């Protein structure tokens, strides 16, 4: 890619969410979202392959439809109440339309149809951006409108996302599609807690970003795109495969790893609000996600491919030092003891 084009795309990726997060007007927030979406399209189509072009087209169409619904909700609210303020979204139809629009942008079930295919057509690093950075601006809009949104609708969308995210990842062999359904399942937990405690939602999102970024960076280093390739990655970097196992267990939410902390806080908040039945249903639905995380862990560290060599470790060149990966891996696996401190942050 041309360096000037890359600089423009990088600037758009950074400025788009910042404009949306710092704005209090619907038009300004919409401009930030559009800037963010339009700069992602050339990144997805950068491979110049039919699958990448198809993925970029799907991404453009779904984001355009979501932007149309967002503007429609803002215009309806302005028509009835004369307000462009994001925190004064008081019309019920506008609130529902805005929730649907942001759900399409975030790929929450049942509006997730585009997300696995787009991730499969993109590169690993582009998929990392789609599952982390691109979710920041829509989530910020939902947090700003959280006082006026329908709690029942959000809990229903959250439980549907947890269930479909776990169900869809069961029979997948492509790692990027598995991570797509994993993202949908984690988004369900964020939706469920959105109106009850936005502070816990933001903490959940930050920890989700750390765990997902670690997984994608490891996949990029190991050059593994499917289950059969992940089995032979142990012979290249044994230590990184061990960390991959811990990170997958953290994504599954097993104690005492980092991923258990946000789920614990969400279930605790549901219990305080006397929503124990919904909490039980969320825990039961998350068992589906646990299964495919355990399957990936089994392929990562426990199995070896058939080989005729007595010594399975392959000869290899010295690998590069990955500073970013070394920095965020402890955050993705070992933050559970710091949970009281994280919860106390205002």
Curated annotation (Swiss-Prot):
It is a multi-pass membrane protein. Keywords: Electron transport, Membrane, Mitochondrion, Mitochondrion inner membrane, NAD, Respiratory chain, Translocase, Transmembrane, Transmembrane helix, Transport, Ubiquinone. Belongs to the complex I subunit 2 family. GO terms for molecular function: NADH dehydrogenase (ubiquinone) activity. The keyword Transferase does not apply. The chain crosses the membrane at residues 7-27, 59-79, 93-115, 151-171, 178-198, 200-220, 242-262, 275-294, 325-345. It comes from the Eukaryota. Core subunit of the mitochondrial membrane respiratory chain NADH dehydrogenase (Complex I) that is believed to belong to the minimal assembly required for catalysis. Complex I functions in the transfer of electrons from NADH to the respiratory chain. The immediate electron acceptor for the enzyme is believed to be ubiquinone. This is NADH-ubiquinone oxidoreductase chain 2. Its EC number is 7.1.1.2. GO terms for cellular component: mitochondrial inner membrane. GO terms for biological process: mitochondrial electron transport, NADH to ubiquinone. It catalyses: a ubiquinone + NADH + 5 H(+)(in) = a ubiquinol + NAD(+) + 4 H(+)(out). It is found in: Mitochondrion inner membrane.
């Amino acid at each position: 890619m041309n360096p000037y084009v890359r600089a423009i795309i990088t600037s758009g990726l950074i400025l788009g969410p910042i404009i949306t997060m710092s704005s209090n007007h619907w038009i300004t927030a919409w401009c930030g979202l559009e800037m963010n979406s339009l700069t992602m399209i050339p990144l997805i189509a950068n491979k110049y392959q039919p699958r990448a072009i198809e993925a970029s087209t799907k991404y453009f169409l779904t984001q355009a439809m979501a932007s149309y619904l967002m503007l429609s909700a803002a215009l309806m609210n302005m028509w009835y109440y004369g307000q462009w303020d994001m925190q004064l979204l008081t019309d019920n139809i506008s609130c529902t339309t805005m929730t649907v629009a942001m759900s399409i942008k975030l790929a929450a079930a049942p509006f997730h149809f585009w997300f696995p295919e787009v991730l499969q057509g993109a590169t690993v690093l582009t998929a990392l951006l789609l599952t982390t950075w691109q979710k920041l601006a829509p989530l910020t809009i939902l947090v700003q409108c959280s006082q006026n949104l329908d709690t029942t609708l959000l809990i229903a969308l959250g439980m549907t996302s947890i269930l479909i995210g776990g169900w869809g990842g069961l029979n997948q062999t492509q790692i990027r599609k598995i991570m797509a359904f994993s993202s949908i399942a984690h988004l369900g937990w964020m939706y469920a807690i959105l109106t009850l405690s936005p502070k816990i939602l933001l903490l959940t999102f930050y920890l989700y970003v750390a765990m997902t970024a670690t997984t994608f960076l490891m996949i990029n280093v190991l050059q593994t795109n499917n289950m059969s390739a992940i089995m032979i990655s142990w012979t290249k970097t044994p230590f990184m495969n061990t960390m991959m196992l811990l990170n997958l267990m953290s994504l599954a939410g097993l104690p005492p790893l980092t991923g258990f902390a946000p789920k614990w806080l969400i279930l605790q908040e549901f219990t305080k609000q006397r929503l124990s039945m919904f909490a039980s249903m969320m825990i039961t639905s998350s068992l589906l996600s646990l299964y495919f995380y355990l399957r990936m862990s089994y392929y990562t560290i426990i199995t070896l491919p058939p080989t005729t060599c007595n010594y399975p470790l392959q000869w290899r060149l010295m690998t590069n030092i990955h500073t970013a990966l070394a920095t965020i891996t402890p955050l993705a696996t070992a933050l559970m003891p710091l949970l009281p401190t994280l919860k106390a942050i205002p």
